[in-house]
Structure formats: C-alpha cells, structure tokens
Amino acid sequence: MKILTKDTWQIIRQNWKNILLFELLYRGITTPVYMRLVSRGIRLALRAAGYSYLTPANIGNFLIQPVTLLAFAVAAFVGILILSLETAGLVTAFQGSAYYQKLTPLHILWGGLQKMKDEMEKRNWQLPLFLAAQYLLIHLPFILRTIVRYKPANFIFQELKKQPVAVTFLIILLIFGILAMIPRSLTVYGCMIEQKHFHSGVVRSWQMTHKRKWRIASLAMFWELAVILLASAVYVVSVCVAAVCVVYFSRQSLAM
C-alpha cells in the first residue's frame, strides 16, 4: 500500500495545486446549482402531487407520481453528467501529470469535455452509469449522514432499524456491490485513456487488478477513512471557531 500511495503521489504532485483548485472551483459552482435544481424539482413535484411537505403517510403516493419520476430522472441525468465531467477532468489531470505536463484548471476542464465527447462518439453510455454507482458506493457514509437529517428520511431509517432482516439484506447487498466494484475500478482508465469500449474497459480492468484486489481495496479504504477523519476535524474546528466568534461578538455588543 505504501508503494501504491507513493506512486500515486509521484503522478499527481506535478499538478496537485491545479487539481485542488479545479476541484474547489468545480464543486463550488456545480454543487449549489445542482442542489438548487433538486430542491426546485422536489417543490414542483410536491405542488403537482397536491402536498405541502413529505410525511411517512404520503411519501409512497408521492414517489409514484409522473411529475416526481420526471423530476428524479432530470436530477439523476444532470448529476451523472456533472460527475462524469468531473471524472473526465481528473483523468485528464492525472494523464497530464504522468507526462510531466502543467495543466491549469481550464485545461483540465477542456480535457474533460474532450474525453466526454470521445465517450459519446464511442457510445459508452454504460460508463456514466458505472461512475454514478461507483460514486454512490464511495460516498455512501456522507450521503446517508446527510439524508437522515431530513424528514421523512429519518422516520424511514428509524423504522428500517427495527427490521433486522431488511438491515441484514442491505448490508449483504452493499458488501456484494463493493466486491463487484473492485475488479472494475479501473474501467475508466481503459475507456478514457486506452480508448476502449465499455466492455473491453471492464476486461482490461480485470486484467490490471488481478491479484491486487485486496491491495487496491485497502488503499481505497485507507484514504476514505482519512478523508472522513479530515472532514470531521475540519467540522469540529469550524464549530469551535464559530462558537468563539459568537461569544466574542456577543460580549462586545453587551459591553456597548
């Protein structure tokens, strides 16, 4: 794992500042726009279904409404498109770093657009769906932590916890999904860099990950835990700083 981490750093250090800047700009622009789109879509679907808000009683009927299905389809399409473009941009950045090229965030974005165009010409429509599934598995802890804070998802998860059979089934399904995804983790490399079609990219990924599955899984798990710990630390520090600022300005106001 140490060698894999070192090799990865050797590749990205050529452009790590621009990769970080690209991620900050890309996520900073696309995330608020996408969240607003999803929020408006849900409000429109609620209005069309005749509801003011979601409850455990009306969520079933709400989900089968045609407008709801259309809103979810649009949100899924836009989300997959945003995710695919980001992935293509990062592949461009790593590919450029391997050839010792300095790439600006604009070059990374343009390279991502070019790779997206190539995938469309090859009709690799399975690749964006694969990327979405991979993204959901990797970010599942963050997604669940966000969803359970809102109604009626919190009620649904509370009821789900009371069903051990359902929980066991979901855990088995998750483990199966992760194990199935590991041998296919380098499919993007085969499609976007080696210019293969999706099925050939999957085969190429199997070849490259052969006898390295557990090493790749351990490396991915290590960095996932590192990101979670870093995000938690940043959150705690932010809360502490905010609390100190509130106390300070409150005392200043009282003193006046």
Features from the language model and the residues they span:
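Hydrophobic alpha-helical membrane segments
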Residues: 1-256
